Amino acid sequence: MVPQKTLLSRVFLYITIPKSFYLTYYIDQFYFKKNKIWMFKLMGAYTFNKSVINFDGLKFIKLLGTGSKDGFSVIPDFSSYVMITSWENDDFRKKFIDENKLFQEIIIKSSKRIEIKIDPYNYIGTWNGVNPFKNKSSYKEGKIIVLTRARVRLNKLINFFISTSSAAKSINSRKGADYYKGVGELPIIEQATISIWKSEQSMKDYAYSNKSHLKIIHKARKDKWYSEELFVRSNIISSKEFK
C-alpha cells in the first residue's frame, strides 16, 4: 500500500525497499479510436490518483501522455497513452487489473492495450527525486526497452526543442530500433522517451556512434538543459496485445 502522505502531484511512491527485494515492472500502452477526450482529461486528474493511491502491492505508477508524430511535438497524440507501474509481485498486479474499476474502464474504452513486462538491469538518475528501479539484474540476450526521462529547465525549452528534432528523425530510421515514442507527464517540460531495440548492442551502436545523438548529449550537458534525468535499460520478459 502506498502512503497517502507521500503523494506529490503526479507522484505515487515511496517506501523503503530492501536491497534484496525484487519488484515486477510493467509498461502498458493504451490506444484509442474513440473516447480520446475522456482519456486526455484523466491525465493527472484527482479521479485517477484517488483510484490507485492505496492499492495493495503498488510501489510506483505513472500515467503518461504522448506527443504526436515522433513524440517531440508540442501537440499531444490523443490516441496513445502509457502507464508505467511496479509491484511487489505479479499477484498484486493481477488483482489490480481484476478489481480496479477505473483501470477496467480504461481497458474497455481503449481500442487496444499492449502489456510489456520488463526487467530493469541498468539505471541511473532519478524521477521526482527517487529512482523507482531497484532490481539487481543483468542483460539477457534479445530485445531491450529503453526509458529516458528528463525535466527540462524553463529557460532551455526553445533550445531543447530546436535541437532534439533532428535526433528524433535519426532514431526512427536507425537500424535496430523497432519502436520509438516520445512520452511525458507534463506537456513540454517533463519529457520522456520509450524505445525498443533488437539488442543492447544495436542501442549502443546508435547511442555512441550517431553524430546527431552525440551532438545533442554534448549540448545538453554543456548548456545544462535538464534539472533532473533518468535513464533505464530493461530486458523484455513478455509482450502481450489485447483488443
Predicted feature locations:
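Short S/T/G/P-rich N-terminal loop/turn motif that feeds into the first structured element of a domain
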Residues: M1-Y81, D90-F96, I108-A192, S202-S209, ...
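A common structural junction motif
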Residues: K101-I108, L214-K215
